[in-house]
UniProtKB/Swiss-Prot annotation:
Keyword line: Cytolysis, Host cell lysis by virus, Host cell outer membrane, Host membrane, Lipoprotein, Membrane, Signal, Viral release from host cell
Name of the protein described by the UniProt record: Spanin, outer lipoprotein subunit
Signal peptide: 1-50
Superkingdom of origin: Viruses
Residues forming coiled coils: none
Family: Belongs to the T7likevirus o-spanin family.
Cellular component terms per the entry's GO annotation: host cell plasma membrane; membrane
Bilayer disposition of the protein: Lipid-anchor
Pfam families on file: O_Spanin_T7
Cellular localisation: Host cell outer membrane
Biological processes, Gene Ontology terms: killing of cells of another organism; viral release from host cell
Gene: 18.7
Length: 83
């Protein structure tokens, strides 16, 4: 009788372990994909910051002197109020 009980117990444990393995197989690819994505983000960030990439220089803008206002409005107002 103990052998039948042991066989049933072994069978039940085997079924439980199979269910556990199947559930791991379903959730493991999700975790694996998330970890691979996180790893790739880290690698890209590290390689991007260490590459010392040369950014294009901003264009040097020159302003035509005829567009500049002489005298300045504040100095003109100070002259008006000081008189």
């Amino acid at each position: 009788m103990s052998t039948l009980r042991e066989l049933r117990l072994r069978r039940a444990l085997k079924e439980q372990s199979m269910k556990y393995r199947l559930s791991i197989k379903k959730t493991l690819p999700r975790w694996k994909g998330a970890l691979i994505g996180l790893f790739l983000i880290c690698v890209r960030t590290i390689s991007g910051s260490g590459s010392e990439s040369n950014l294009p220089e901003p264009p040097k803008v020159s302003v035509d002197s005829s567009l500049m206002i002489e005298p300045n409005l504040t100095t003109e107002m100070l002259n008006v109020f000081s008189q």
